[in-house]
Swiss-Prot record:
Its main location: cytoplasm. It holds the Pfam family CoaE. GO terms for cellular component: cytoplasm. Its EC number is 2.7.1.24. One of its GO terms (biological process) is coenzyme A biosynthetic process. Pathway: Cofactor biosynthesis; coenzyme A biosynthesis; CoA from (R)-pantothenate: step 5/5. It is an enzyme of class 2 (transferase). It comes from Jannaschia sp. (strain CCS1). PROSITE patterns: DPCK (PS51219). NCBIfam families: dephospho-CoA kinase (TIGR00152). It is found in: Cytoplasm. This is Dephospho-CoA kinase. Belongs to the CoaE family.
């Protein structure tokens, strides 16, 4: 069975860029966000059950995330019900990924809320990517996100310091070259002797 490294980091910390660096080194990467998007897309396994729970959430055969967010804002109890639909489907997709890549020496499980959802229990080790609060803010605002939205997103995530304290490995993502070197070093370390 492959060594599973859970990858996480708060918004703007460089998680997607780091995941791409693992892919560039031919390490299979499973992306929780992409899986949820697939489940919400036309023909996705979550579409019908969510539409039954939140009438009108389906538009053109797919889940309209804005409608879903508005429904959750109106009735917070919906979130747990939606999670009860989505989480088992995500776990099934992750298990299929692990089966497909069972002979790979290393796989990455890219899970934004790794610690918050208990996803770290499915991992052999965890990696948190981090940068300074100033750089994080600069990156997120450069995407067109407002200060208020950034504050709201961060308030719903585990603080970076706590993530770093819980992580097996931490990579500072201040520079692309430094991050690339750290990723390559970690891949070598975790695949030595395989």
């Amino acid at each position: 069975m492959s060594f599973a490294l859970g990858l996480t980091g708060s918004i703007g910390m460089g998680k997607s860029t780091t995941a791409a660096m693992f892919r560039d080194l031919d390490v299979p990467v499973w992306d929780a966000d992409a899986t949820v998007h697939k489940l919400y897309a036309r023909g996705g396994a979550a579409v019908a059950p969510i539409d039954a729970l939140v009438p009108g959430a389906m538009k053109d055969g797919a889940i309209d995330r804005a409608v879903l967010r508005a429904a959750i804002a109106d009735d917070a109890s919906l979130l747990k019900q939606i999670e009860a639909i989505v989480h088992p489907l995500v776990a099934k997709d992750r298990a299929m990924f692990r089966d497909i890549h069972s002979t790979a020496p290393l796989i990455i499980l890219d899970i934004p809320l790794l610690f918050e959802t208990g996803g770290d229990a499915a991992c052999d080790a965890t990696l948190v990517v981090t940068t300074s609060p100033e750089e994080q803010r600069r990156r997120v605002l450069a995407r067109g996100t407002s200060e208020d939205t950034l504050h709201d997103l961060l308030s719903r995530q585990m603080p970076d310091a706590e993530k770093r304290a819980r992580a097996t490995y931490v990579i500072e993502t201040d520079t692309l070259d430094g991050t690339r070197q750290d990723v390559a070093h970690l891949v070598s370390k975790l695949t030595e002797g395989t």
